[in-house]
Amino acid sequence: MPRGSVLLLASLLLAAALSATLGLGSPVKEKRGWTLNSAGYLLGPHALDSHRSFQDKHGLAGKRELEPEDEARPGSFDRPLAENNVVRTIIEFLTFLHLKDAGALERLPSLPTAESAEDAERS
């Protein structure tokens, strides 16, 4: 048994010596100071975009401070999406057609009528 423990001890010492000389051990990560990413994470995008310093920022720094925007919430009907704009455009067009059929647009002087467009084509 003593021969086995000596062999085990010798193999462990050899492995430690080889890993230290060949650089196979765990490399120590160097800390090189602030980077743009770390500053952006700690200060948030509003601080980097306006180039404010640490002293100008009031309150705690970090992304935890930022509130989620109401527009990004799923199920919100007030958000300006292309779908909402299309629906609004269709509703406005249908309202325009309804007013045109009712004759309400004939009293407005700023809109050209269909008769005046025909008169312009004839002359």
UniProtKB/Swiss-Prot annotation:
- PTM sites of type Alanine amide: 61
**Source taxon at top rank:** Eukaryota
What SMART domains does the record tag this protein with? Galanin
Positions of the UniProt region annotated as Disordered: 53-79
> Mind naming one GO cellular-component term on file for this protein?
extracellular space
Q: What is its main location?
A: secreted
Listed Basic and acidic residues bias regions? 53-66
Q: Name one Pfam family in it.
A: GMAP
- Residues found modified as Phosphoserine: 116
Q: Which GO terms describe its molecular function?
A: galanin receptor activity; galanin receptor binding; neuropeptide hormone activity; type 1 galanin receptor binding; type 2 galanin receptor binding; type 3 galanin receptor binding
Alphabetically list the UniProt keywords.
Amidation, Cleavage on pair of basic residues, Hormone, Neuropeptide, Phosphoprotein, Secreted, Signal
Query: Is NADP a UniProt keyword of this protein?
Result: no
The family classification in the record reads: Belongs to the galanin family.
What is the stated purpose of this protein? Endocrine hormone of the central and peripheral nervous systems that binds and activates the G protein-coupled receptors GALR1, GALR2, and GALR3. This small neuropeptide may regulate diverse physiologic functions including contraction of smooth muscle of the gastrointestinal and genitourinary tract, growth hormone and insulin release and adrenal secretion.
UniProt protein name: Galanin peptides
* Organism per entry: Bos taurus
The upper taxonomy is: Eukaryota, Metazoa, Chordata, Craniata, Vertebrata
Q: Which gene encodes it?
A: GAL
